[in-house]
Amino acid sequence: MWLLLPILLYSAVFLSVRHIYSHWRRRGFPSEKAGITWSFLQKAYRREFRHVEAICEAYQSGKDRLLGIYCFFRPVLLVRNVELAQTILQQSNGHFSELKWDYISGYRRFNLLEKLAPMFGTKRLSEMFGQVQKVGDHLIHHLLDRQGQGCPQEVDIQQKLRVYSVNIIANLIYGLDINNFEHEDHILTSYLSHSQASIQSFTLGRLPQKSSYTYRLRDLIKQSVELREDHGLIRKDILQLLVRFRNGNEVSGDKWQLEPINDADKLLSIKRLAKVAEDLLKVSLDAVASTVTFTLLEILQEPLIVEKLRAEIKELSNENGQLKFEELNGLRYMDMCLKETLRKYPPLPIIERVCRKSYSLPNSKFTIDEGKTLMVPLLAMHRDEKYFSEPMKYKPLRFLQTANDVGQCEDKTKSNVFIGFGIGGSQCVGQNFAKLVIKVALIKLLQNFHLELDANQVKTLKVSHRPAPFIHTKDGLKVKLKRREINTKFYS
């Protein structure tokens, strides 16, 4: 009798797993060959712990526009065609979303981000530009001070840019007037090492995680909000607009002062406001730092590109060392370089969405059932020769814009292949803010320093997506800095 129990248990598990691994075949979708074999279980392991690389391998394994795959015991539908991905994510009318109901009652995260999108309009960004530029100056002062103290000229620029990103977040999202290059023991500086040591499992890493950092970051938000609501502090930053939204005030327009309402009527509790801020912290930290890092990695191998960028930057007025917001849009060649960086090293390598109600694919017999996961592998698409010639070569001029051309890609007929900041409901609402922060860092570094890469480092440099999905260089990026002679008024 007792011998039957393990046999029955094993049989139940075996049949259950086999049923899961036959999901796409039973529904008639093109799918990979799945089974309880050692080779397939290795694939499942790789998709769990080396998620990005394994999904890219699945993208390259066939020619079907759709492919049913399995991430551990989770059926996932992989989209391998750009036009189909755009159709699904742009025209599916709410069939797909990123998360369950969150933040505030009556809002999905998708809709909440739509409400907050006006915070990142041109008018608002121009008024926040002074704060961004001040943080950029902190970065340059720190690097100049290291040289002045006789320290080695070689620095890990990736780590410095992560601190720069944290400073941006601290000053504009958490409302703190702080320079983390000087306050190395601050909680937001400590968060850098905490985020790098997060869970490596892709599935487990998405589960709600509470740590002492969550509560300490919430305390920062609580203190900053109290200063604004109870003491009338007005500061032109993102937090000020979040607090306006919390009080039911418009975030568009040109008003910064609060019109407080009763606590019972507030749209966001402190807890949920802190969750919004922490999510912005997680996304912005790696997106900004990685984009600037990989731009430097590529352009420093091409002196002609650096020369063109410096010539473009030289045309900026730069009065008393200060940039003008309205002039940054005229940096066309820098825009091309950033697009090429985002193509080759997208901060969001995979878009993952959950079907919230059954969706019939256009011009197809297939239907995606509610609850099933859809993946769009941006990294693999951006490096596909079908869409971009010489995909591993850094070619900013592939995005050259002309008067009669939208300027997506010069060497292919596909006009909408580039998806640098997402697509449809997954598009980053803060992309204009991110571009602004990235441009300020690049301009100030190229203005103030001659930068040089070690050729041997470039040969051995490894790009990593661990923890998934963020992209970074595994061992940092060492760059030799030499101060450039510029206008003495720049730092008077």
Curated annotation (Swiss-Prot):
One of its GO terms (cellular component) is endoplasmic reticulum membrane. It is an enzyme of class 1 (oxidoreductase). It is a peripheral membrane protein. Its EC number is 1.14.-.-. Its cofactor is heme. Pfam families: p450 (PF00067). Keywords: Endoplasmic reticulum, Heme, Iron, Membrane, Metal-binding, Microsome, Monooxygenase, Oxidoreductase. Coiled coil: none annotated. InterPro entries: Cyt_P450 (IPR001128), Cyt_P450_E_grp-I (IPR002401), Cyt_P450_sf (IPR036396), Insect_CytP450_Detox (IPR050476). GO terms for molecular function: heme binding; iron ion binding; monooxygenase activity; oxidoreductase activity, acting on paired donors, with incorporation or reduction of molecular oxygen. It is found in: Endoplasmic reticulum membrane; Microsome membrane. Heme binds at residue 428. It comes from the Eukaryota. May be involved in the metabolism of insect hormones and in the breakdown of synthetic insecticides. Belongs to the cytochrome P450 family. PANTHER family: CYTOCHROME P450 (PTHR24292), CYTOCHROME P450 310A1-RELATED (PTHR24292:SF93). This is Probable cytochrome P450 310a1.
